[in-house]
């Protein structure tokens, strides 16, 4: 009896399959997700050597970089505004004219503040982690490859930037920045404590191709190549220097990468 019931179930299943409308291979809808590449995140950290709360903000960024990786969460410390200082009278200052341009353009009210992927406005420290998490959840179709060739005799670095989009054409700008790690310079702490040998990392040094970069249009049909030759400013240590490159437009930063200037 059990065997007979089994055969009846098999026959019923065959009948159901025979009643299904066959779909040809050329009629099936196959959803193909859009191609994407690994998304990195840029945090522009507005800071100053006379800002007593800025060292703690820098520590927060370092902890977030340990979580995500320093090549994925790319930090740039922009010394600007009234609490930043320029070099004078034997005191090493990290403030730059380009940094002041950004400080004014983004209407930074005070420091420490940050802009993350140039979306969401100027943010206080306690919101950084959440905003960074949200940005990593986004996707991008932009691929950037940076190559640096440094000549110690001339202090010139040749920068080759290869860019491509995996989808429709993208209009934007390529920005190249010089950033330096392990910069020893004074820093003020709470209770007006001054550390004259404080080590500053990811310090913004210069906008290599101008404050707002180079206008370009990326196509999925070809790789866009930019060649740039730049002379390192006096005082910048080649072994501590990085080139940060990113593509941005009105929607924010689409992709960011970094590359060491010299591996020696």
Region locations from a protein language model:
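Bacterial Sec-dependent N-terminal signal peptides
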Residues: 2-5, 14-42, 46, 52
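Short N-terminal helix-initiation segments at or just after the protein's N-terminus
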Residues: 20-24, 57-58, 190-191
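Intrinsically disordered, low-complexity boundary segments flanking structured domains
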Residues: 28-30, 61-66, 102, 130-135
């Amino acid at each position: 009896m059990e065997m007979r019931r089994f055969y009846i179930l098999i026959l019923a299943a065959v009948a159901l399959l025979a009643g299904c409308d066959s779909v040809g291979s050329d009629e099936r809808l196959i959803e193909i997700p859009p191609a994407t590449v690994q998304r990195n995140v840029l945090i522009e950290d507005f800071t100053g050597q006379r800002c007593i709360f800025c060292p703690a903000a820098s520590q927060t960024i370092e902890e977030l970089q340990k979580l995500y990786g320093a090549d994925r969460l790319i930090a740039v410390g922009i010394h600007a505004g009234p609490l930043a200082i320029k070099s004078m009278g034997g005191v090493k200052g990290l403030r730059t004219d380009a940094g002041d341009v950004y400080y004014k353009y983004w209407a930074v009210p005070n420091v420490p503040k940050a802009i993350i992927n140039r979306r969401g406005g100027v943010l206080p420290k306690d919101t950084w982690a959440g905003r960074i998490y949200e940005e990593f959840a986004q996707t991008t179709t932009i691929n950037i490859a940076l190559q640096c060739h440094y000549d110690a005799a001339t202090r010139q670095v040749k920068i080759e930037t290869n860019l491509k989009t995996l989808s429709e054409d993208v209009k934007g700008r390529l920005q190249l920045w010089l950033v330096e790690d392990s910069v020893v310079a004074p820093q003020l702490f709470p209770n007006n404590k001054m550390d004259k040998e404080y080590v500053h990392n990811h310090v913004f040094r210069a906008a290599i191709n101008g404050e707002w970069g180079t206008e370009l249009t990326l196509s999925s049909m070809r790789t866009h190549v930019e060649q740039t030759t730049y002379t390192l400013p006096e005082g910048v240590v080649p072994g501590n220097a990085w080139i940060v490159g990113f593509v941005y437009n009105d929607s924010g930063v689409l992709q960011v990468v970094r590359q060491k200037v010299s591996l020696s």
